[in-house]
Amino acid sequence: VDVSQARKDISADAAGKTFSIATVVKVDGIAWFDRMRDGVKQFGEDTGHDVWQVGPSQADAAAQVQLIENLIAQGVDAICVVPFSVDAVEPVLQKARDRGIVVIAHEASNLKNADYILDAFDNKAYGDKLMEVLGKSMGGKGKYLATVGSLTSQSQNEWIDGAIAYQKEHFPGMTLATERLGGGE
């Protein structure tokens, strides 16, 4: 990605405005998203923008949609979202975009109603690497389990899809013991 033309100073002072930016996570109160909250807070401190993070207390697509509805009603400038279910958030994110709210998504490569989609890495390549390490550790033989945070988690399912495809090609002596399991995020 060529970022040479990307704006470097994104502070409220440089923009001449303080933007309100909400991050909506899959579920509040778990370590992964607690760490994300630290980054959201740091971004606010670094730039002067009004930023915060919210999420449902349990992994619940309807509760996440309601949080986004509330943010639309508040008139935020941007919503950053890690969807629990891409299908569930599509309509409400379209509504946000129709109202001029910028939508930025993470862990949702197939989301249609986003202005930007950011992922940390290539999901298939990540799955390939997971299986490469597992396959070598198992000597290329035996049964294994595949788990995801939730069965609706797009990125994690892409990891597992990549891993299974890699296993079939490189470790035919291995088999998936059961369908992938969801851990409830």
Predicted regions and their residues:
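A residue-level marker of the well-folded mature domains of exported/periplasmic proteins
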Residues: 1-185
